[in-house]
């Protein structure tokens, strides 16, 4: 895995069974020394080349299973390990054009030993009041290439 949260490997358009491009995908790694349960994750807003992508257009694939943001919120059993990146799939008819694209995405998660005052202030779209990248509390940016 790469050091950056947004991984370059796996950034590509997605095709359906008829060969039509229905969107794109990219991978993110968990910047934490322990894994987390899906219910702990707080997905943020994705921007691609400055365009906002709505959360309902994104699914997360973890351990080979695909989840919506709503499904993750209530999943207390599925565990995301630090050694396995998640695949985020974005519904976008026609996908992305070949070339470079700027991705901006933040997510964070709760922790049992994180003080409540910090958990109450979690906003995956903004930098945290306390800089703690190990909790994913920062917005990630990366320029990636689709060929």
UniProtKB/Swiss-Prot annotation:
Q: Which reaction does it catalyse?
A: 3''-dehydroisoorientin = 1,5-anhydro-D-erythro-hex-1-en-3-ulose + luteolin; 3''-dehydroisovitexin = 1,5-anhydro-D-erythro-hex-1-en-3-ulose + apigenin
Biological role: Carbon-carbon bond-cleaving enzyme which participates in the metabolism of C-glycosides. Acts on the C6-glycosylated compounds 3''-dehydroisoorientin (3''-oxo-homoorientin) and 3''-dehydroisovitexin (3''-oxo-isovitexin).
- InterPro entries per the UniProt record, alphabetical: CGDB (IPR045959)
Summarizing activity control, the record says: Activity is strongly reduced in the presence of chelating agents.
TM spans (from-to)? none
Keywords on this record?
Carbohydrate metabolism, Lyase, Manganese
Q: What's noted on cofactor binding?
A: Can also use other divalent ions such as Ni(2+), Mg(2+), Zn(2+) and Ca(2+), but Mn(2+) is probably the native metal ion.
Q: Which residues form a coiled coil?
A: none
Gene behind this protein: dfgB
Per its UniProt record, the required cofactor names are:
Mn(2+)
Superkingdom in the source lineage:
Bacteria
Thermal properties of activity per the entry: Optimum temperature is 60 degrees Celsius.
Family label: Belongs to the C-glycoside deglycosidase beta subunit family.
Q: What is the lineage of its organism?
A: Bacteria, Bacillati, Bacillota, Clostridia, Eubacteriales
| Protein's recorded name | C-glycoside deglycosidase beta subunit
Query: How does it associate, per the subunit comment?
Result: Heterooctamer composed of four alpha subunits (DfgA) and four beta subunits (DfgB).
Q: How does activity depend on pH?
A: Optimum pH is 6.0.
GO terms (molecular function) for this protein are: lyase activity
- Enzyme Commission identifier(s): 4.1.99.-
Organism equals Eubacterium cellulosolvens (strain ATCC 43171 / JCM 9499 / 6) (Cillobacterium cellulosolvens)
């Amino acid at each position: 895995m790469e050091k950056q949260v947004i991984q370059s490997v796996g950034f590509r358009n997605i095709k359906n069974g008829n060969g039509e491009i229905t969107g794109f995908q990219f991978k993110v790694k968990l910047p934490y020394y322990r894994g987390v349960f899906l219910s702990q994750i707080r997905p943020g807003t994705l921007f691609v080349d400055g365009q906002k992508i709505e959360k309902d257009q994104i699914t997360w694939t973890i351990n080979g299973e695909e989840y919506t943001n709503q499904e993750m919120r209530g999943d207390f059993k599925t565990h995301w390990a630090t050694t396995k990146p998640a695949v985020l799939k974005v519904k976008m008819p026609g996908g992305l054009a070949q070339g470079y694209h700027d991705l901006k995405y933040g997510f964070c998660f709760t922790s049992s030993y994180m003080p409540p005052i910090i958990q109450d202030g979690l906003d995956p779209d903004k930098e945290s009041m306390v800089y703690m990248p190990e909790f994913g509390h920062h917005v990630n940016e990366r320029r990636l290439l689709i060929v």
